[in-house]
């Protein structure tokens, strides 16, 4: 059984009125035996849209079948805001996932990121810029809450 939890990634909608959010697909099971890795999925869409179904939900189900809890990020796209808004939204997905790690039976030290196309660009960006003071505050960097433990890129725009 899979439970789904949705969370807003920002307090306010973007410039187009879209509210960036994440959908956590959490596998059921014995919490004492089934602590799982997780993967934060950044679907592609050329920063024009987010291909939530093809590169988000379907990929989440494939990872779930392999024993991962999966988090799909629906980030700001064209006209909704400028960089680094999108990378900060992905970072927030990592923070929320780590905040709920115990409740969702996630190993907080085994949270990966994956992305394809524009989502691959975001996955590569959070993987290399999570400790960049031009993007994040010193406090955010020191907490290491948004640092991916592994990265999977599928035809990234880099």
Feature locations, PLM:
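A domain-start/cap signature at the N-terminus of enzymes
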Residues: 1-25, 30-35, 158
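Catalytic nucleophile-loop/oxyanion-hole region of alpha/beta-hydrolase
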Residues: 51-53, 73-108
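Short beta-to-alpha linker loops that shape the active-site pocket of alpha/beta-hydrolase fold enzymes
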Residues: 45, 69, 74-78, 157
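Primarily recognizes the serine-hydrolase "nucleophile elbow" in alpha/beta-hydrolase
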Residues: 92-158
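Short beta-strand element of the alpha/beta-hydrolase
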Residues: 35-44
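Short amphipathic alpha-helix adjacent to the substrate-entry channel of hydrolases
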Residues: 52-71
């Amino acid at each position: 059984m899979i439970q789904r939890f949705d969370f807003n990634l920002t307090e306010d909608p973007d410039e187009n009125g879209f509210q960036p959010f994440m959908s956590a697909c959490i596998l059921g099971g014995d919490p004492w035996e089934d602590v799982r890795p997780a993967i934060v999925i950044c679907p592609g869409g050329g920063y024009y849209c987010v291909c939530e179904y093809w590169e988000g939900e379907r990929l989440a189900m494939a990872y779930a079948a392999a024993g991962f809890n999966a988090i799909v990020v629906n980030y700001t796209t064209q006209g909704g805001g400028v960089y680094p808004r999108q990378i900060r939204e992905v970072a927030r997905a990592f923070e929320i996932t780590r905040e709920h790690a115990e409740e969702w039976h996630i190993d907080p030290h085994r949270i990966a990121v994956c992305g394809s196309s524009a989502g691959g660009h975001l996955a590569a960006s959070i993987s290399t810029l999570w400790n960049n003071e031009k993007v994040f505050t010193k406090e955010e960097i020191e907490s290491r809450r948004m640092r991916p433990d592994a990265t999977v890129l599928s035809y990234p725009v880099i």
